[in-house]
Amino acid sequence: MTFLQFAYKNVTRNKRAYLAFFLSSAFSVLIFFTFAMFLFHPALKEGYLNNIAKKGLTAAEWMIFVFSFLFVLYSVNAFLKSRNKEFGILLMQGITPGQLRKLITAENMIIGVMSIAAGIIGGFIFSKTFFTVGAYILEMDALPLYMPWKALGITACGFLLLFFFLSQFTILFVRSNTVIKLIKGTGKVKPEPKPSVLLSLFGIACLCGGYGMVLKGNVHGAEPFIILLLTVIGTYFFFSQSSIWILRALKKWKTFYLRGKNIIWVSDLVYRLKDNARLFFIVSIISAVAFTATGVLAMYKSTVGAEESAYEMEYLSYSNNPKEQTHLKDIDHELKTHGFTYTKDKIDVSYVRYQEGETVPPVYMISESDAAKYFHVKVNGLKEDEAVYFPGTYDRNFKNEAPDQLKLLNQKGELSDQKLSVKEVKKPLISLNAIIAVNDQTFDQLKSLGDKASLYGYSYDHWKDSLEISQSLQNEIYGNYIDVHSDFASKAGTYYDTVQLPSLSLFIGLFIAIVFFVAAASFLYFRLFTDLDEDRERYRSLAKIGLSEREMAQSVTIQLAILFFFPFVIAVMHTLFALRTLAVEGYSDVAGPLSLTIGGFFIFQLLFFLAVRSSYLKKMNK
């Protein structure tokens, strides 16, 4: 038998332990490779959105690679610790430290090459679905398949180097131990975890404080940051201290603890929660971020509609604007150069402000005749002191609400004696700002309160294709934001800011969260099967004094269920409290997408739990 064959036999003989490592590594390679295929796709070479998407995907690639580095480091170290006894015996039988180093390197490279091959093959198979989902979420044209030589080379070389250098690094953990320590293996008796009561209560208090601030409503200013800080700190101490403290309290509750199988799973769970506290903390926070992002994106998509604007492009010129004609010529030139056939309207508006508490929001005032002529909106029957309010699609007020009464200011910023009652709130007309429509007589009387302005509206087809020229015009019009006498907005720009950019963030975030989920489940698998022999011996001893196979299975099931779903439940709680602020404000459209995302993660977690439980019980019963 050659040395390489010996290494291969070791891998196949320890396939139970290596299986989760192999599958998780292959999954990391698959995600990295499919992201790389997306990143280097020929269709993404041009375009403003495509450039932003490439930057986001590049950041995601680095995050996945760094995470893969930490994941492989942890996994290899865990495997080496579980095989300390085997290494000690090999050293006693005459294998040299150099040969042992070569053996470990060969084993890791075998697993690495197999993982890379499986991940790349899986990436090819999965790529069409990935491209379809990515294009759908980002609302781009469908991406065709191609031969990704660059993505293939970067993935293969990057992960080969990753596995090689990490195998060299982890050898240090073995070389630092004596033969006696290696032979003892992992059989050392662990002391029972003793949590700090003070830190346990502190963790619970932080969570209660964060949740309480959300429940009181009206979150503003620095409060969101304080809530986030309290939640993160509270979650960490809840997993590392409070959960252990609660289990120790259950042990003191004799009527519960000494009843049937409870004594077994509670005692075992104390150690396992302590061992996995940091892992649970990371998974719960990342999952909560992914779930919350889904809800926020759903709110954006349902409340900020670029399509609601009457014009594809809007330019507002205030009085005494020296660059008005220059800007209008630039807009005409860009639209004509890029092949857009358009029409242009000019609307006289009055730029006025009204008092709302301590703020003085701006609003564009137009006459009811112009509202009917240019926006095809009927607001007939308005009295002299009445107005119809149209929020802007880019307005901060996503709920389409308005004050019952508008107390208008004059051009000096002083409160005038003119007040308008809001008769009705309708859908937005433009992206730039809110509009109020008044009858023609009232408009003539009140327009002098504000700054005279001209609103130019451009209408054309295929507005989603005008993002690049919109960005170019916006940079030209606003310049360095000094001495600006105009405003500019476009459907494409609004749509990009409120839908496509958040969608890109969610697209990347969800896949990174999936990688973390898979890795977390794999970590649990490693922990369980590393301690399998010790657990089997303990249950055999308990069976001799009356523990039935059914009770053993129930004890294992309870422990695994808590280990798999505990961080998931905490993440869902964080998400529900985070999104409660939206519910308080009246946003009810987050439930569907949020339920779909959480349900998807739950089904994945459930399937992994059932698979691990089945495999673990089979090994325990041998």
Curated annotation (Swiss-Prot):
Its main location: membrane. Keywords: Cell membrane, Membrane, Transmembrane, Transmembrane helix, Transport. The chain crosses the membrane at residues 20-40, 56-76, 118-138, 154-174, 195-215, 219-239, 279-299, 498-518, 558-578, 590-610. It is a multi-pass membrane protein. It comes from the Bacteria. One of its GO terms (cellular component) is plasma membrane. Induction: Transcriptionally regulated by YxdJ. Induced by the antibacterial protein LL-37, probably via YxdJ. Signal peptide: none annotated. It is found in: Cell membrane. GO terms for biological process: transmembrane transport. Part of the ABC transporter complex YxdLM which could be involved in peptide resistance. The complex is composed of two ATP-binding proteins (YxdL) and two transmembrane proteins (YxdM). Belongs to the ABC-4 integral membrane protein family. This is ABC transporter permease protein YxdM. It comes from Bacillus subtilis (strain 168).
